[in-house]
């Protein structure tokens, strides 16, 4: 950990910049604790943000420590805010644990951005509405401050990509790409037309981010 903070100090001396973005896919909480302690021990004045996994390890005490050391924001994937689908994709978190994590972060002055997903195989329209409702409530309570929806993409190394039958999906013929062949085209019987939800999800979230639209019925966003 001292090496990381040594490099931070070197970059500050070289550039004069004191803001840092750590690009780990999900920074380990234990590592972040050590980082915060080292920053505070050296009395550095910095700001930083990173990607995290929303789990119960982020206690109020840890989030206070992170904030005190200069952490101003985190981003993490809530993905589908549906208990059934979260379990299906083996996310390893629950709605309840993620919410508690977000609460601890936000109450300590750390901005929370979350990545959201729709169109996972077997997901229903009702589950999509329920997910949007949970996201609305998180914004209303001030537990998240920014969010972005993306359409589910099946990748070759994911559990669903390796075993599509487990989510009632089938691989389709893939046209080779000279750059990369990570994403796998797939099909699902009786799948909703997810494309008709894209604009509504974006518009709803845009409003929630600005603390408006909480009283709009969920289905009205998709008219």
State what each model feature region is.
Residues 22, 76, 114, 135, ...:
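Hydrophobic, well-ordered secondary-structure elements that form the walls
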Residues 50, 114-116, 149:
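Structural beta-sheet core signal
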Residues 29-31, 121-124, 155-158:
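Short catalytic/ligand-binding loop motif for oxyanion handling, primarily in non-cytosolic enzymes
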Residues 126-223:
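C-terminal accessory regions of radical SAM enzymes
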